[in-house]
């Protein structure tokens, strides 16, 4: 803060306010900065009140017929059928790509789909869909970005000056952003909103489970026993928060040799059945490690990726996700 204040200079002495010792009592409280500016020879200050300009009045009072936007106003206008979270526990298992493929598969079934990227410090959803433009602000709230197939997307990366800008925030700020993405974004009418959670059981996941009415969680793991161990932590968090688990998806289960067609288990034997049995949840499917998927995610063309493997997984998720047992998602 003192470094920033150093940019202000005394017009007569040509030195910064900090160098002249004019900045005192710097305090930071809940994002609000206060400090005392001590000016030599100044004993009191008089305020010259003038009439506000028309622009200043418009910022404070809405025009006739308009209402001032209140935080969370969009939430009451949204009509979202189901909210599904995708959670992994361990990073690097392809959770975000599974979330994106789920959204694409549901959209291909004719559903109205949105994706809320709750991975605030490591967002990747916009990159996969080739989105970069800042979402506009509407009269009620933020309008989500839209992919070429009509999937609505909201992510912190769409609000940053560059896609590789670091988000160095503590828990309260991260939680606040997630709540805004739910309550201040005009999602409109959706059949399903897919929420891409960050790895682990951090504040972000806790905020989602406490603030957003989830209908279920899809767990994503990989063949490694380590990934299975960590995803069990994620499952236990969901249970403690009273969020139902739709099932388990194993990603990067195997790859197919492009020359001979042999199935190769790159990360060793699958642990999916064992992990699903330990958790008592269904194994929804196993997804191969496909270089084409990686290329199309990098190119922002995940909607153009074609595979026969994920469609039955998406259908199982749609069939199982429900408000109460026995009620299908659509």
Q: Where are the predicted features?
A:
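Short, non-transmembrane amphipathic alpha-helical segments
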Residues: 1-5, 19-22, 29-49
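Phosphate-binding loop that captures ATP/GTP phosphates
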Residues: 106-171, 175, 182, 273
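Walker A/P-loop phosphate-binding motif and the immediately C-terminal alpha-helix
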Residues: 82-120, 231, 235
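Phosphate-binding/switch loop-helix module in NTP-utilizing enzymes
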Residues: 160-208, 227
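Short glycine/serine/threonine-rich phosphate/pyrophosphate-binding segments
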Residues: 92-101, 122-126, 197-205, 226-230
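C-terminal lobe/tail of nucleotide-utilizing enzymes
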Residues: 20, 39-40, 48-71, 235-330
């Amino acid at each position: 803060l003192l470094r920033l204040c150093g940019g202000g200079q005394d017009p007569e002495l040509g030195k910064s306010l900090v160098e002249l010792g004019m900045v005192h009592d710097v305090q930071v409280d809940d994002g609000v900065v206060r400090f005392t500016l001590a000016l030599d020879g100044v004993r009191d200050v008089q305020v010259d009140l003038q009439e506000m300009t028309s622009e200043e009045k418009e910022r404070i009072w809405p025009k006739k017929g308009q209402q001032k936007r209140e935080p969370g106003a969009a939430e009451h206008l949204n009509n979202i059928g189901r909210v599904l979270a995708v959670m992994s526990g361990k990073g690097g298992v392809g959770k975000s790509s599974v979330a994106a493929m789920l959204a694409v598969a549901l959209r291909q079934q004719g559903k109205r789909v949105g994706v809320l990227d709750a991975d605030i410090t490591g967002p990747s959803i916009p990159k996969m869909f080739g989105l970069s433009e800042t979402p506009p602000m509407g009269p009620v709230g933020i309008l989500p970005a839209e992919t070429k197939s009509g999937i609505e997307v909201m992510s912190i990366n769409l609000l940053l000056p560059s896609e590789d800008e670091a988000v160095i925030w503590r828990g309260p700020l991260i939680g606040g952003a997630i709540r805004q993405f739910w309550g201040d974004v005009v999602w409109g009418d959706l059949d399903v909103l897919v929420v891409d959670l960050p790895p682990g059981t951090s504040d972000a996941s806790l905020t989602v489970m406490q603030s957003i009415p989830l209908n279920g969680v899809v767990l994503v793991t990989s063949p490694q026993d380590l990934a299975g161990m960590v995803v069990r932590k994620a499952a236990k968090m969901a249970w403690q928060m009273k969020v139902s688990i739709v099932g388990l998806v194993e990603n990067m289960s195997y790859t197919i040799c492009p020359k001979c067609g042999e199935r190769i288990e790159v990360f060793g034997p699958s642990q999916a059945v064992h992990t699903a049995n330990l958790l008592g949840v269904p194994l929804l499917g196993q997804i191969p490690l496909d270089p084409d998927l990686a290329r199309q995610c990098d190119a922002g063309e995940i909607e153009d990726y074609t595979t026969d493997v994920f469609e039955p997984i998406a259908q199982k998720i749609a069939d199982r996700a429900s408000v109460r047992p026995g009620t299908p998602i659509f």
